[in-house]
Amino acid sequence: MQKIKSAALALPALLLAGCAAALPAENTATIETAAAAAPQTLKVYTSASLAPAAQAYAEAQGVALTLTDEAASADLLLTDHAPGGSLLDVTSDTLLAAAAARAGITENANALPLGRSLYGYWARADVLNALLGDGAAAALQTANWEEWSDFVETLSAWMAEPKAATVTLSGTDYTLPDARPGSLTATGVFAAPLDRASGYTAALLAADGTYTADALTGPLNGVYSAVTLEWDHMAADGGEGIFRRAKLTDLLAEYGADTCNGLVLVPFKCQLDDSDLTAEDYNAEGLLNYPVLADVGSIAINAGTSADGLKAAKSAALWLYSNGAGEDALTETLGVVTPWNTAAGTTAVTAMQVQQVGTGILPGVALDTAAADALAANELTLQDSEKHTKAERTAFVDGALAALGAE
């Protein structure tokens, strides 16, 4: 890995440091598909961002789909993070074990990964160009923390009272216009995030995967700075923002492919310096400037489901993993890079994702549902904060350490 030497989108609105070469070669292993006809009913517990995959299966196979809010009562679970509960070991079944092997899983596991997706701040390219001129997105992507935070604060003041203002991004000056562009309908710099947990990737990579207070405190202080900047300049009452923090999968489910084709990605930037890092494979500049290719979630089957429910859930999982239309549901409908390293480039935004993976990304860090929920709840404690004190920062870091199970 090459090291980098440092230093709404106007809808309800939306890179960090390791480098990756082009997409790894596709795993061409095939899976024997079940001969039995698809079952007629399937009960699914799913997140909003992954629901389109279940719906695609049901439509393709003529299955009656029931969505439930109770994970324990579902046959199949499609979750953004590793679920808890009593789940079937996918390697205990011959066909599911073959699917697991395609994802590189050969030992006991209770879920199949669904793939990865770009994560960060998403914004409409036309809005950024109207505000700053051509090349704005590229300048924002490589802006350092001081430039980024100053830009956010200046833009927020400009939105309250538009007048010409100069900001520096990646060492170049850009001027905000003296009047609000007609394409800008946002009421804040940021809209509420669709995914908070993936924002901890840079901190965890900076700590070299070491879940201790000593390794994580510095990087988590950097996350605190990023989160408070976001809260301070967020659109009120769920309003539209220029930027929205999310995975591409979240946005495709929320807005559809046509809207997403006009988006560009800016990193979720945390205030890090090299003294915060214990990792040798990353540095602060790289963790600031490269995007995250975040885990999008997993497929799991409840161990206690009925025989018919088990059959239905297995058919759905195998369809996604071994059927051409199922793979299209992952790569085109959800917009993921699959666990066996295939991806769609049929739309502007998915083609951009493929290009970015070939240029450089940060690898996502897997979190279970409990940890992800706790990290999100910890961020919400800052929502009404007006004075960012040392005590508040310490409490936030302590909350994040507890959520991550740090020692």
Predicted segments with their positions:
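Conserved N-terminal structural module of periplasmic/extracytoplasmic solute-binding proteins
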Residues: 6-9, 13, 19-83, 329, ...
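Pocket-flanking alpha-helical
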Residues: 55, 69-111, 153-166, 250-257
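Helix-loop-helix "hinge/cap" segment bordering the ligand-binding cleft or interdomain interface
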Residues: 67-70, 105-197, 208-235, 305
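Hinge/lid segment of periplasmic solute-binding proteins
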Residues: 78-120, 126-129, 265-267, 274-286
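Periplasmic-binding protein-like
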Residues: 160, 164, 317-344, 348
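Extracytoplasmic/periplasmic substrate-binding proteins
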Residues: 200-307
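Short amphipathic alpha-helical coupling segments at ligand-binding clamshell hinges
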Residues: 307-320
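Conserved C-terminal helix/tail region of periplasmic/extracytoplasmic solute-binding proteins
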Residues: 338-407
